[in-house]
Amino acid sequence: TYVGLLERSKEANASGADIFVSIHHNAMPANATVTGIETYYYEYDSDYPPIINEDMHNDPTRILESADLASAIQGSLVENTGAIDRGVRRNTFAVLRETAIPAVLLELGYMSSPTELAKLTTASYQTTLAKAITAGIVAYFE
């Protein structure tokens, strides 16, 4: 069942969780040679006002904690997978803007790259990704 962007944030906000991690796979059909992993955290932009997260959307502490979480997970992913490091980036994605706890969005590879897609569809690489995400989260909390 598809869960809408605002509903994802609402569920995260109501869950009592300490962090929010949104897992995705990227695509760039115009350039099938692009590969790598990138991690996003929220960047305030007044052109994107909050819808459900008015109190925390521009909270400096939440944004700093999100940046720390993004760095910890990105570092672990690159170290454990050997993937191209496309960096920690900032964006106004709805799930980052509307979530009231430290939040990151992971792009774990490019499905438009035949080479990367072949890796992404194997159970062993999926396990490697899951373990790397877990290690990054553990490092964030230490």
Which role fits each region the language model picked out?
Residues T1-E142:
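Active-site-proximal helix/loop segments of hydrolytic enzymes
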